[in-house]
């Protein structure tokens, strides 16, 4: 059953976000659980162990929001949810900066956990974002990983 009153919030922005404020916005009398995911800029690239100085994220305005909305609509069809917020930052980010916030509210915790995982897995592969990592030695585009593709296959079964 799809909840017609679900609160959906999608933002692409340069500025940081306040996890506490975004979580509070998901609170309502129908929700029994809220699950958040916060992605951060890591200091080391796990593939070549380069020490990262910064990461620059770019997106395709309009298309990015549309793709995120499609992902959210899929999650709404799969689970009974009461609210979803996706905030993704763009621009130059430094080590430990917040990149992405995914918050999901539901009547029941398992729905919130599953939907949050689903949304994040699909964001990693389907939302049009491009990343450039800058280290001491180089500046390079980040390629998609097979493990990210594998993560979405589990949801298609």
Each model region followed by its residue ranges:
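Phosphate/diphosphate ligand-binding glycine-rich loop within oxidoreductases
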Residues: 102
């Amino acid at each position: 059953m799809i909840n017609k009153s679900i609160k959906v919030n999608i933002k692409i922005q340069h500025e940081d976000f306040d996890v506490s404020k975004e979580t509070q916005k998901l609170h309502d009398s129908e929700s029994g659980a809220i699950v958040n995911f916060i992605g951060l800029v890591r200091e080391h690239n796990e593939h070549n162990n380069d020490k990262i100085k910064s990461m620059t994220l770019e997106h395709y305005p309009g298309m990015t929001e549309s793709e995120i909305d499609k992902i959210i609509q899929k999650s709404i069809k799969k689970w009974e949810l009461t609210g979803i917020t996706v905030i993704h930052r763009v621009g130059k980010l430094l080590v430990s900066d917040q990149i992405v916030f995914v918050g999901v509210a539901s009547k029941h915790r398992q729905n919130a956990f599953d939907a949050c995982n689903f949304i994040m897995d699909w964001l990693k592969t389907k939302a049009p974002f491009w990343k450039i990592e800058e280290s001491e030695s180089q500046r390079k585009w980040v390629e998609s990983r097979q493990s990210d593709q594998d993560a979405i296959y589990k949801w298609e079964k």
